[in-house]
Amino acid sequence: MAKNNKKIKTSLNIIALNKKARHNYFIEQTLEAGLSLEGWEVKSLRDSKVQIKESYVILKNNELFLFGAHISPLKSVSTHVNSDSTRTRKLLLNRLEINRIKDNINQKGATIVPLKLYWARGKVKLEIGMAKGKKSHDKRQDIKLKDWQRDKQRTLKETNKIFNF
């Protein structure tokens, strides 16, 4: 009897990250949403030709849409297809999730930001975060904390080198 020696791929392949979102916002809760995409967009996502740093999510007519995400079309895209790289894309969520998001948005200073774009079970998913904006002193505090952690790790590494020879 032959054994099936297929390698199992990880179920989570990150396409794009929005690192600025965690710097500019306090992320309170995250959700996974599907995306309504066209064929050429999926091909571009397979080549990681996407930018979500300047994108944002908006609620319109009880539906969520992703604005400002730039998906670069491939050179091999058909000429008869109009490839708009920054078109608005609908997010696919349950009604219960949309209602929960709507309740959170109604709070002062609350917003929805895209955090990462990834493959899950062969489909493109977008992780969105319900967030509140940080003030400049909060950002400075985070930078100080990161610097302190980095310096602490550096000194631990140096002391380990001295004692371990």
Curated annotation (Swiss-Prot):
GO terms for cellular component: cytosol. Signal peptide: none annotated. Its main location: cytoplasm. GO terms for biological process: trans-translation. Keywords: Cytoplasm, RNA-binding. Gene3D superfamilies: 2.40.280.10. InterPro entries: SmpB, SsrA-bd_prot, SsrA-bd_prot_CS. GO terms for molecular function: RNA binding. It is found in: Cytoplasm. NCBIfam families: PRK05422.1, smpB. Belongs to the SmpB family. Required for rescue of stalled ribosomes mediated by trans-translation. Binds to transfer-messenger RNA (tmRNA), required for stable association of tmRNA with ribosomes. tmRNA and SmpB together mimic tRNA shape, replacing the anticodon stem-loop with SmpB. tmRNA is encoded by the ssrA gene; the 2 termini fold to resemble tRNA(Ala) and it encodes a 'tag peptide', a short internal open reading frame. During trans-translation Ala-aminoacylated tmRNA acts like a tRNA, entering the A-site of stalled ribosomes, displacing the stalled mRNA. This is SsrA-binding protein. It comes from Ruthia magnifica subsp. Calyptogena magnifica. The gene is smpB.
